[in-house]
Amino acid sequence: DAFAQIFGTIKKIATKDKKVGLFLVAFFLYIDGVGTIIDNCINIGTDLKLDSVGQVVFLLFTQIVACIGSLVFGRLSQRYKTTTLLYVCIAGYFAVCLYALTLHDLIGFGIMAFGVGCFQGSLQALSRSYFSKIIPPENSGEYFGIYDIFAKGASFLGSLVIASVKLAGGTINVAVATMAIFFAVGFVFLRLADKYDAPRHENN
């Protein structure tokens, strides 16, 4: 049974590979934030009276910046620890969330799109790289299965938060700014995972 296998793997991670578990919590939070921001950039553009053509242009701009950002972080990964670069990317997204509060024109929207692009592809690639380094090689298949489930579920929880804020009367800018919480807590859990030293019995 697929669900039994999934829950069995999650239980194994929670009891035997807590470093992996801490990272997965961090990953779930910050990648959910990434997905939510990307999904709602269009809504912010609409509020700023950006037409459909303009939205497509900004999306293409974001993807181009993301490609360049991935190349830059790829070079940096040869000199710095993966976790250090992950901290930079998460902090960058945290700043993007807060910047959303100041948006009032298309120039500001362009700056936000640039910020999203800078860290989007890099955060995803660095996360996968770090995960591959901390999991037991013999469990890579099933562990990456859980990782991919978390990745594909990106923006689920964040979308609920966005909807709740808007339902309470908040603007889309305020709603996006609340996603900073996801990155802040994700940063903390990544720090915990990075500093976690597994007791000997966890490796037996």
Task: For each feature predicted by the language model, list its residue ranges.
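Juxtamembrane intracellular "pre-TM" segments in multi-pass secondary transporters
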Residues: 1-24
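Short amphipathic helix-loop junctions that connect adjacent transmembrane helices
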Residues: 39-55
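Helix-to-loop junctions at the C-terminal end of transmembrane segments
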Residues: 68-82, 166
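Structural signature of the two symmetry-related core transmembrane helices
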Residues: 84-99
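Helix-loop junctions at membrane interfaces in 12-TM secondary transporters
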Residues: 101-112
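Intracellular juxtamembrane helix-capping segments at the cytosolic ends
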Residues: 122-135
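A membrane-interface helix-boundary motif in multi-pass transporters
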Residues: 164-183
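Multi-pass alpha-helical transporter architecture, strongest
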Residues: 177-204
